[in-house]
From Swiss-Prot:
This is Probable potassium transport system protein Kup. One of its GO terms (cellular component) is plasma membrane. It comes from the Bacteria. The gene is kup. The chain crosses the membrane at residues 20-40, 60-80, 111-131, 146-166, 178-198, 216-236, 257-277, 289-309, 347-367, 379-399, 404-424, 429-449. Its main location: membrane.
Amino acid sequence: MVQASSHAEGGQGATRSLSLLVAAVGVVYGDIGTSPLYTLKEVFTGGYGVPVNHDGVLGILSLILWSLLWVVSFKYVMFILRADNQGEGGTMALTALARRATAAYPRLRTLMVICGLIGASLFYGDSMITPAVSVLSAVEGMGLAFDGIDHWVVPISLVVLVALFLVQKHGTEKIGKLFGPIMVTWFVVLAALGVHGISQSPEVLKAFNPGWAVNFFIVHPGMGVAILGAVVLALTGAEALYADMGHFGRKPIARAWFALVLPALVLNYFGQGAILLQNPDAARNPFYLLAPGWALLPLVGLATMATVIASQAVISGAFSLTRQAIQLGYIPRMHIQHTSSDEQGQIYIAAVNWTLMVGVVLLVIGFESSGALAAAYGVAVTGTMLMTTILVSAVMLLLWKWPPVLAVPILIGFLLVDGLFFAANVPKIVQGGAFPVLAGGVLFLLMSTWKRGKQILVERIDEGGLPLPVFISSIRIQPPHRVEGTAVFLTARPDAVPHALLHNMLHNQVLHSQVVLLTVVSEDRPRVPEQERFEVEAYGDGFFRVLLHFGFMDEPDVPAALKLCHLDGLDFTPMRTTYFLSRETVIASRLEGMSRWRGNLFAFLLKNANGNLRFFNLPLNRVIELGTQVEI
């Protein structure tokens, strides 16, 4: 009986591990898994001048192989995935870790925040480029099957992409269950096509020798660094391994990489290389020309599904990043809609969705081909990778306390490779790479303005503020009329009297029997346990101070959290509790702290941001807002 039970539990564990691995393949590896569609095509037809001959093909294959091994296998799987913030990954989670690591060094902490914002800004640019270049590259395969259909590539791609964005608000819970099996099928097909190609020209297996990569740099010194700008296309999506860690955990992501994804990618790239050795003209689209003629149309269909799944993963990643950034105070509050009753992580943010859709449509119309878009792709990818390395450097040295003699050589290796890839893409800024730079610059400006504006706003509100003990003392001297019920005043400063409370006293000249000064604290960790959710302090005379702590992945539901507050005499009965909010109207001035044009920008962002009412899930019929004007 016991033995049978243990076998059953072991079988259930194995089944769960396998299902997690398949799910990880469907979500995490869509982007990097569709890179074979365009990487070698861009290398040999992207204007780099790489000769399609024996040494050129083997040199490029060796560069791709060892880039995958160093950047993805070594850097991300072995190191970056260990830099989790209580299980969560991604740019914002890593920025929160780096902030914690550099807390004793204010200037270094500011630098880490800037690097985090740059990385996040470039990720949004990547979130527009990935759907455009992936779907275009898949649909372009139809041009090989049908003559004269090339002019339909852009319209068909637009239909697919617009449909993808239109269904976002309905969620992908049901169809999402198919993502894993479809992507597993995709990788099996990649591997099979690769084996088919290699069998016709096993000579390509020599590229496992890194000497061919070194030889390429020696023979083509002027082209060596520049070609890395195309080779990096094989690494697009590496950041997703870290960004999606919170959904699956480090082990399933690592196992999926080594067991399926890496072998399939290497086999396919080498198979394409084998075809190029046999027929240099195949450089116009080596991926599709690797397939037998009868398999071309089914392959186009499968590739289109794979690229849609890759695009979905990036879009979902943008939603998740936005929620984290909102909680950490880097982005104005937006309405977050949950699309699944079971999965808390499945969310929809309309403003992000429509912004991404407009960007993707403009990219497809403006660039018209995956090859033209490739230049823009590399800048966003390498910039994000470089920022991740800088952030993890602070974590390794200051938080993990790794010995410098061990950490510094590894970090120098990471920074050197990332720096070379980024430098190779800098010249592409004038060839189309300006898009992610401009998009990232605009987003960085918005996020930094919002963060700085909120800091100044709190400082201005605090100026001349009345300390809470002084206010309570005055109440004891001249007691106002008290009414039944609980008044909750939201305030950023728990030690000062909120403006809403002062205005309420001034205009209504009454106080509730219980007055709660509530401060919501956003933590640099993803989730806060319920037992650590609140701090309560009683001041006497019916005054209480409550601090509610939320992580950047928590839902800041204030009424639900207040139900957990247990203190004698403190009553949060819904129909006896009224929430008082301050609604600030910002006026840009010439006061120190922020230039006037940025002050106007912050005022615009504040005016259009979601208020505390919706963000904290406050009951609409129990909220009173009191306005105030603030100069910044």
